[in-house]
């Protein structure tokens, strides 16, 4: 059930060889809600799509939220929900990023996009 923290140094080094990484966010205590806004520049907002549920380890996080009586929104405020690292890139680098992550056998999912918005730094869409 529990695994040691994933160390992403080798993955990030591989990515940075050919991809312009804009921001990197390690999701730790405080979950996505507290950590991601810290790396979003002023005037920008990260739009995250959780409408399909948890992107990784869905059964595990469904069990935790059920037993703890927490909504998925509350879960994203406390846990990483299976998302250990968020890498923000330019959209033009998407295909290259996917290729590199597959090459190093790093599971990934596209969570959303960064848009212009001066009113907030994070918006999460829930199902």
Regions found by a protein language model. Name each.
Residues 1-127:
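Glycine-/charge-enriched secondary-structure boundary and capping motifs
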